[in-house]
Amino acid sequence: MKADQENLPAGYASLLAEIKDRIRSAQYEALRAVNKELVKLYWDIGRMTTERQATGVHGTAVVKRLAADLQAEFPGIVGFSWRNLFYMSEFFTAYRDKPKLQPLVAIIGWTQNLVILQRCKKPLEREFYLRMTARFGWT
């Protein structure tokens, strides 16, 4: 193995380090894109279920059935429990009339959004933690 390293051209180590950094950067950006799309999906599901519930068409039993049907259709995907569907509705309801907060909730992860939503009951407190999480990556 050491003989192989001796035959490498000058600059190989820096090339390898640069490629590794680029791979890690791409992995991080891909994860951020996936998280952003997941939050958008949960927002949309929350919107759809909230709008149906507002018309009196759906209640707890329907949400539980939705959860069971979604879990059956997408068995490898976590996040479609009836409790999480309720969180999605709560998430949408909390921010639907807050256009300046919507870009913030879109860029932080679902778990971070849930923690802020559940622990911060005052709008200004939520806004503070959303901004700090988005800016500094608080977890």
Task: Give each language-model segment a name.
Residues 1-139:
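Basic, low-complexity intrinsically disordered segments
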